């Protein structure tokens, strides 16, 4: 037996170093399958559906319990390459996967992140579009849309106006995926600008459209999330790195303030999937040359990791009856920031609320009963990669048969269309705005 060769083999990494090239569908699939095979204890590879041309929409899950949800462990996701000709995010997510699995057990921060978070990574939502690009271009290429020539970031239901378009297979697959997991936080990776953009992307007068903005009830949290990413990217935070394009102070913008769009994915996530999502524009050039990929990784690595950690902001817990039975489908909302589609507990009675440090009143409402009110104080720093844990015991005897196990969907119609301008579901208060500013400038 050749012992030197044996020892050399043991020292080599389980996955060969991922090169900084663009990986077409076959190469991407081969890499993902190799990772899933060699790191099977912390990864789970699955397809959430197929593109128009039958290509798999792969998702690799990284976590200590990758195959199933565990109570108390929040679900996080990254999605890239929604526009097929915007390619940097696709490669960054492959390198993020490589970094996570090879750092587990070696880097304490990454190990803690994998222990405490279930991370879902979709490198390409539009593989047909990516494969259709024949001549990469900085501004626009055939391949932005899917094979049926639909822009997937205009293809979701819209809460502000009717979006009567043919729902595409890629969009339907993502919508179904969102129903299967309790996603808490997400980001959607794009290219063609350098900015972190937060909801809303569309708007009405009640959300601030008259003032060229459209703000959610959680605007303070969204601004904080966007700044968290942008501030760690040395080029994005400058706000003016892309020539002949709009400048963004501190590398951050409200989506509607930049330009309104109908049927976007980040608004859909926030309103109908109970998931906070922002859009990350990562490169001035949509499809830059391969030799620039290492610098993109270096500029985004810290931001990508730090953003995942934000899934542990705020408070989480379960809602129980007096016999200790978890209560699904119970409305859990923070006073003065009601969502137009109320956030509800999942089938395990779990809730997750992303909140900045401070004092909050939480209303817990079982259908047909008066709200139960509880107060929480979110500390300045999360404890060991965990949000504040606050289980809530409701004064009910026995399981409530009137509560359905699964969450009833809010109708996918323009929910904001006829809402009064003063509604709490549309206007963040002055207090929330001031809190947001304090966290941005004094963090």
From Swiss-Prot:
Record annotation: effect of changing residue 277 to A: 5-fold decrease in substrate affinity. 22-fold decrease in specific affinity. 104-fold decrease in catalytic efficiency. Greatly reduced heat stability
Name of the gene this protein is made from: CPM
GO biological process: anatomical structure morphogenesis; peptide metabolic process; protein processing
Family note: Belongs to the peptidase M14 family.
Residues carrying sugar: 38, 115, 164, 363, 384
Highest taxon above the source species: Eukaryota
Pfam families: CarboxypepD_reg, Peptidase_M14
The keyword Lipoprotein belongs to this UniProt entry's keyword annotation: yes
GO cellular component terms, semicolon-separated: cell surface; extracellular exosome; extracellular region; extracellular space; plasma membrane; side of membrane
Compartments reported by the entry: Cell membrane
Amino acids binding Zn(2+): 83, 86, 190
Summary of activators and inhibitors of this protein: Inhibited by O-phenanthroline and MGTA and activated by cobalt.
Active site (UniProt): 281 (proton donor/acceptor)
Propeptide residue span(s): 424-443
Protein name as it appears in the record: Carboxypeptidase M
């Amino acid at each position: 037996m050749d012992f030197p060769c044996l020892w050399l083999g043991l020292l080599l990494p389980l996955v060969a170093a991922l090169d900084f090239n663009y990986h077409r569908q076959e190469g991407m699939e081969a890499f993902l399958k190799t990772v899933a095979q060699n790191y099977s204890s912390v990864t789970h590879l699955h397809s959430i559906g197929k593109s128009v041309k039958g290509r798999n929409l792969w998702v690799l899950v990284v976590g200590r319990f990758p195959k199933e949800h565990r109570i108390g462990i929040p679900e996080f996701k990254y999605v890239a390459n929604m526009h097929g000709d915007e390619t940097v995010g696709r490669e960054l997510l492959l390198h993020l996967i490589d970094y996570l699995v090879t750092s587990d057990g070696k880097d304490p921060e990454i190990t803690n992140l994998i222990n405490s978070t279930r991370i879902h990574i979709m490198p390409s939502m539009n593989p047909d579009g990516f494969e259709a690009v024949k001549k990469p271009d900085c501004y626009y290429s055939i391949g932005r849309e899917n094979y049926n020539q639909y822009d997937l970031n205009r293809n979701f239901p819209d809460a502000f106006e009717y979006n009567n378009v043919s729902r595409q297979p890629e969009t339907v697959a993502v919508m179904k995926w969102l129903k299967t997991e309790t996603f808490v936080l997400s980001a959607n990776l794009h290219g063609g600008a350098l900015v972190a953009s937060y909801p809303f992307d569309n708007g009405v007068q009640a959300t601030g459209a008259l003032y060229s903005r459209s703000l959610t009830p959680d605007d303070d949290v969204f601004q904080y999330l966007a700044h968290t990413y942008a501030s760690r990217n040395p080029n994005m935070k400058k706000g003016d790195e892309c020539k002949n394009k709009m400048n963004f102070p501190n590398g951050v913008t409200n989506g509607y303030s930049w330009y309104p769009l109908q049927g976007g994915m980040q608004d859909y996530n926030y309103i109908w999937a109970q998931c906070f999502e922002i859009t990350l524009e990562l490169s001035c050039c949509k499809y830059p040359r391969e030799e620039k990929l290492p610098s993109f990784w270096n500029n985004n690595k810290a931001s990508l990791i730090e953003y995942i950690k934000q899934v542990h902001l705020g408070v989480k817990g379960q809602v129980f009856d007096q016999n200790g039975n978890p209560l699904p489908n119970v409305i859990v909302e923070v006073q003065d920031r009601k969502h137009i589609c109320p956030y509800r507990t999942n089938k395990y009675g779990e809730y997750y609320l992303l909140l900045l440090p401070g004092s909050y009143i939480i209303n817990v409402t079982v259908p047909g009963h008066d709200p139960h009110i509880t107060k929480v104080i979110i500390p300045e720093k999360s404890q060991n990669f965990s949000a504040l844990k606050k289980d809530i015991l409701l004064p009910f005897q026995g399981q409530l048969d009137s509560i359905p196990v699964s969450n009833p969907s809010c109708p996918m119609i323009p929910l904001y269309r006829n809402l009064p301008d003063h509604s709490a579901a549309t206007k963040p208060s002055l207090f929330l705005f001031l809190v947001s500013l304090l966290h941005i400038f004094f963090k």
